[in-house]
Amino acid sequence: MKEVGNHFAEQGEDVDFLWCSSDPDSLDGIVLKKRRIALLDGTAPHVVDPQNPGAVDEILNLGEYWVSDEIRAQRGSVISCNERTSAMFQMVYGYLAAAGKRAEFLAEVLQRMLGEESVFEARRALQTKIGSVLTVRRTEAKRNRDRAMGCLQAPGSCKRAFAGAITPDGIKNELPSLIHGLEKVILLHCPEGFPVQKILEPAMERLLDAGFDLEAYYCPMDPAKKLEHIVVPDAGFAIVTCNRYHTVKADSNTQKSLNITLEVPKNVDPVLQEIR
């Protein structure tokens, strides 16, 4: 998959590389966006069955090419390795569940420390910086004119994914590749653990309402709720959350960076200060 993806990327095509969280040097899939073609690893633990076999979906069965006799000779080692791997996965998921509870508690504490006013100011600052993007201003103005004339307005679409993962080699992310080629990057600096979706979700709703197709990237620790990054390719900008677990620098030669900082106040409740 790497060779296929790199082949088309070298020809200038827009290719999504879907990296594996269990093995960060391997791919689970690639997407050739303009061609509307995806190549996926359909084996466990992410089995994918064809939805329209033959008409749309094709199966590449690499099992036709393995040397069965040599693999069968290692049957005991293969089974033992899989059993150890399964046991390790169960242990890791236990640790992640505990870390998830800590993250929930930390989010509540940080909200109390920062207060609604700080969150409101950060939300307003973000909306202002989004409004400074020329493409957004022009698109919203046109949408408003069309609405005034009674024209139907279709919202934009949202692709949801992960920009990073918790891997055996530590926390990994591909943020630099996501902002590559964009004109502006809005960097939202906030304490790790803060529920940054409270700031980002209104921005995402605004952009979708304006008709922009966007990419929304979620936190692996809270994939159902915690929005962390937004990329708007057609408007040439992205919003990236920066903390000690993931940060990115805009290219000073080709990109303009806009910063918003949400800091924990120094004078807070003594109990909360201890937690900090």
PLM regions: where:
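Glycine-rich phosphate-binding P-loop
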Residues: M1-F8, D169-L207
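Context-gated lysine
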Residues: K2, K33-K34, K101, K129, ...
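Conserved nucleotide-sensing/catalytic segment adjacent to the nucleotide-binding pocket
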Residues: G5-R72, G76-S77, L207-R276
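Extended intrinsically disordered terminal tails
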Residues: W19-C20, L106, L110-R123, T139-K142, ...
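Charged, amphipathic alpha-helical linker segments immediately N-terminal to NTP-binding catalytic cores
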Residues: N61-A165, T261-E263, P270
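Long, low-complexity, Lys/Arg-enriched
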Residues: E83-T85, P168, I179, R276
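Generic hydrophobic/packing signal
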Residues: Y93-L96, L110, C190-L200, M204, ...
